[in-house]
Amino acid sequence: SSDLGKAIIDVELWSEDGNESTRTLTIPPRSTKNYSLTTFMPGKKLTAFHLLSRSGLVSVALFDERRKGLTAYGGDYIAPNPPPSKKVLIAGIPGVKFVKKSKITSQRIRLFVPGESDAVIQVNYISPTGVFAPVGLDSLRVPAQKVVEVDLSDLPSDRLFALQVLASEPVIASVLTRGMFNNQRELVWSSSVESTRGEVMALAERSGYLSIVSNAPEVSFTVVKDRGKKSVVTLPIDAMAIWKVPDTVHEIQFKATAEPTYLALAIKSISGVATTSLAPAQSKELTALPVLDSTLYIPATR
């Protein structure tokens, strides 16, 4: 909480069993508090929640870390989802060729229908090699008010790919990837994303991969390097394109486009793997790189 007064927050909770009791949290003024979600819903395996601030201005971050004893199984910050929609796109999902030594052990889509009616859902894969609907994911019935997780099958053999979710009722969706990347156990969360409206993304001299999903025949953006040197990059797109971001790039400037364009950034290093969707509401004011090292977390005051 960055306010001079205390903040009061309602946390609405759901699990695989349906609606759970709402928790009310009080955050002292100008302070940071950490809560374990396992204490909110003990014994639940699939969760979704919605935060409502009754009073005060707060910043919220969610971190998922898996370990058993002294063995770490990875960790990742989870980006917030946009409002529920009948058309959802999840970009920047790691594929089997993300790094040279990639072995994906499981990849699942987590779905939640917040309304009162069940939803019929179709999932399409989008990659640089094309768009297709995998067998078994073309007509899923998801019960309302319950969190559901479905295994992804027949995955594209690309470095990165995206998912398009078409639903009869508004939904939210995320993808959880688990596997070995460069001989390191990792988990990666990929959240849905809204189309860009012309944002600027600042980078900390670290290479990565930019995922671009659009129906436009090509997309252009401006790259800023050392001493403010600018250059324009134009990429042809067949549903999706991937651009390798050099570590010399300080900034990428996007323009609003007639066709909806969706962006995500993926980074790999000796510390691990991380991806993040680029949300317009966040990137106009603050842009943060994915956190690669789950053992280091320094809260920043604003």
Question: Where are the regions a protein language model picked out?
Answer:
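A cross-kingdom feature marking solvent-exposed beta-strand/loop segments within repeated
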Residues: 8, 14-50, 127-162, 227-251, ...
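Short tyrosine-centred short linear motifs in exposed loops/low-complexity segments
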Residues: 6, 43-46, 117, 158-159, ...
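Short, tandemly repeated low-complexity microdomains enriched for cysteine and small residues
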Residues: 9-13, 20-27, 60-66, 71-73, ...
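Short acidic, flexible loop segments centered on an aromatic residue
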Residues: 2-20, 52, 103-133, 166, ...
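Transmembrane beta-barrel architecture of outer membranes
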Residues: 22, 32-36, 46, 72-75, ...
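Long, internal scaffold/assembly segments composed of regular secondary structure
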Residues: 81-151, 164
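Short, aromatic- and glycine-rich surface loops/edge beta-strands on solvent-exposed regions
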Residues: 45-55, 160-169, 249-267
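Conserved functional hotspot residues at active sites or interaction interfaces
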Residues: 2-3, 56-115, 171-217, 236-239, ...
